[in-house]
Amino acid sequence: MKNHIIISLLFLLVGCSKTPTDLDTLNKRGDTYYKVNSEEPFSGSVINKYESGQNQMKGSLENGKDDGLVTIWYENGQMVIKGTYKDGKKDGLQIQWWDNGQKMYEGIDKDRKLDGLWTFWYENGQKLKEETYKDGELISKKEWNEDGSVKE
């Protein structure tokens, strides 16, 4: 009896998990994605792939707009961008990488405004600059040369 309940729960959980929808199968009007032949904005997990089959983008939409974690990859499988969105706007941690795998930048966005510490790197991995923002306004900045020495 116990095994029967466990197996039933497993089938229920598997049945509830949805395969992400291919982004190319949705219609985009303005900045909102819709189901085909529908006026209803799409909500759910989405994915887009390169012709090679490699993931290009994974994310989720709520009422047709980016909502939650969005991840984008180069065709070679290296991550390009990882960031969070709310109602189609960047909201939370944003990270981007150079195509060689080195970080390009990392920081927090709040309603499309930079907030807190943002760090930027040269393609060689050396720190380029640190900027501190409050509500999108630059508060302080420190810069480095590509060799690691502080810029004057």
Walk through the language-model features, giving the residues of each.
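Glycine/tyrosine- and acidic-biased, solvent-exposed loop/turn segments at the edges of beta-strands
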Residues: V14-E152
